[in-house]
UniProtKB/Swiss-Prot annotation:
GO annotation, biological process: chlorophyll catabolic process
Motif segment (GXSXG): 145-149
Top-rank taxon: Eukaryota
SUPFAM superfamilies attached to this UniProt entry: alpha/beta-Hydrolases (SSF53474)
Pfam families attached to this UniProt entry: Chlorophyllase (PF07224)
Catalysed conversion reaction: a chlorophyll + H2O = a chlorophyllide + phytol + H(+)
Subcellular location: Plastid, Chloroplast
Gene designation: CHLASE1
pH dependence (record): Optimum pH is 7.5. Active from pH 5.0 to 9.0.
Enzyme Commission code: 3.1.1.14
Entry protein name: Chlorophyllase-1, chloroplastic
Length: 329
């Protein structure tokens, strides 16, 4: 998998923008219809996938970049269908393995190894399972993960040459001192320079049960701060919680229960949160994969274009060390 193109500079901005009067196209559904494909490890394809997979792909003719998505703690990959569909409708192929189903989850090292098997399967196994005239560009793959899957995504990026990494409220344990293995937050700086976007939640650090689902010291801020060699963006969805990117009512009973009762959730509809997260992901990858920076730079310049409130928006361009910042007021 090839490295990213060079990042583009951004001007330094501080303060709070005026309220946007219109949304951006990345926050609404894209031009492509989508097709969902389910693969089991018993699939007749050669080689079969090492883990069960959901693939959501644009249904149209073309060549599309790939996103490897890693689910959150003990959640079903089926619980993210709205986000997958939104992203795929903008011209990306989402590959989402079911790494495990158990509660408690396996060791983080075992989870990482399972994700690595799927990453290694992509170049040989993905294309033959796509619709006719739909081609996957596996030379430029982004890895994205939610919750504990975010930790796995960053750990996988230390091992493989992904084109970009995206963390959706990533979590590395219950605290900095009780982190998951491999303990990547023990590093002062991650040993990669690929572009990064981290999206955190304002309520992820608020406990609902025994502990917060995205506790301070092991959450999105820690991941962002360690990407010192990367062009990197950070967004915080102020009024939403750790599970608010999931479908409203996940079909898997376990995921439904975890989604509704385990973490502190926001009081508003999840739909704007999902559209915001999906839109940021699309805008980020359009910028760094295709050189189409307009939407991503507009969000950084004026976060009120997003369908939800975003605080602590920050972008650091590694090539120039210029910073775009919107501080919380």
């Amino acid at each position: 998998m090839a490295a990213m193109v060079d990042a583009k500079p951004a001007a330094s901005v501080q303060g709070t923008p005026l309220l946007a009067t219109a949304t951006l196209p990345v926050f609404t559904r894209g031009i492509y219809s989508t097709k969902r494909i389910t693969l089991e490890t018993s699939s007749p394809s050669s080689p079969p996938p090492p883990k069960p997979l959901i693939i959501v792909t644009p249904a149209g003719k073309g060549t599309f970049n790939v996103i490897l998505f890693l689910h959150g703690t003990s959640l079903s990959n089926k619980s993210y269908s709205k986000i997958f569909d939104h992203i795929a409708s903008h011209g990306f192929i989402v590959v989402a393995p079911q790494l495990y189903t158990s509660i408690p989850p396996p060791s983080a090292t075992n989870e990482l190894n399972s994700a690595a098997e799927v990453a290694e399967w992509l170049p040989q196994g993905l294309q033959q399972n796509l619709p006719e005239n739909t081609e996957a560009n596996v030379s430029l793959v982004a890895v994205m993960g939610h919750s504990r899957g975010g930790q796995t995504a960053f750990a996988l990026s230390l091992r493989y040459g992904f084109g970009a990494v995206i963390g959706l409220d990533p979590v590395a344990g219950t605290s900095k001192t009780t982190g998951l293995d491999p303990s990547i937050l023990s590093f002062d700086s991650f040993d990669f320079s690929i572009p990064v976007t981290v999206i955190g939640t304002g309520l992820g650090g608020v406990a609902r049960c025994i502990t917060a689902c995205a506790p301070e010291g092991a959450n999105h801020e820690e991941f962002f701060n360690r990407c010192k060699n990367s062009s990197r963006a950070h967004f915080v969805a102020t009024d939403y919680g750790h599970m608010d990117i999931l479908d409203d009512n996940p079909s898997d009973v376990k995921s439904w229960a975890l989604s509704k009762y385990f973490c502190k959730n926001g009081n508003e509809s999840r739909d704007p949160m999902r559209r915001c997260v999906s839109g940021i992901v699309v805008a980020f990858l359009k910028d760094f994969f295709y050189g189409d920076a307009e939407d991503f730079r507009q969000i950084l310049k004026d976060p009120s274009f997003a369908p939800i409130k975003l605080d602590s928006v920050e972008y650091i361009d590694a090539s120039s060390m210029l910073t775009t910042t919107h501080v919380k007021v």
